Swiss-Prot record:
Transmembrane stretches, start-end: 18-38
Originating species: Prochlorococcus marinus (strain MIT 9313)
NCBIfam families xrefs: PRK00753.1
Domain of life, per lineage: Bacteria
GO BP annotations listed: photosynthesis
Pfam families: PsbL
Cellular compartment(s): Cellular thylakoid membrane
Name this polypeptide is given: Photosystem II reaction center protein L
Stretches of the chain forming a coiled coil according to its record: none
Subunit architecture: PSII is composed of 1 copy each of membrane proteins PsbA, PsbB, PsbC, PsbD, PsbE, PsbF, PsbH, PsbI, PsbJ, PsbK, PsbL, PsbM, PsbT, PsbX, PsbY, Psb30/Ycf12, peripheral proteins PsbO, CyanoQ (PsbQ), PsbU, PsbV and a large number of cofactors. It forms dimeric complexes.
Entry annotated with the keyword Thylakoid: yes
UniProt keyword annotations, A-Z: Membrane, Photosynthesis, Photosystem II, Reaction center, Thylakoid, Transmembrane, Transmembrane helix
Role of this protein: One of the components of the core complex of photosystem II (PSII). PSII is a light-driven water:plastoquinone oxidoreductase that uses light energy to abstract electrons from H(2)O, generating O(2) and a proton gradient subsequently used for ATP formation. It consists of a core antenna complex that captures photons, and an electron transfer chain that converts photonic excitation into a charge separation. This subunit is found at the monomer-monomer interface and is required for correct PSII assembly and/or dimerization.
Topology within the bilayer: Single-pass membrane protein
Length: 39
């Protein structure tokens, strides 16, 4: 497992970043939809 930690670390960090971006996008979309419906 310690033979090549670089190729194993990069996809994990990329996956985590994309996951956070996805959650942020969903959160912003939900806030916009709730604001639009309440107004």
């Amino acid at each position: 497992m310690e033979q090549n930690p670089n190729p194993n670390n990069l996809p994990a960090e990329l996956n985590r970043t994309s996951l956070y971006l996805g959650l942020l996008l969903v959160f912003v979309t939900a806030v916009l939809f709730t604001s639009y419906f309440f107004n």
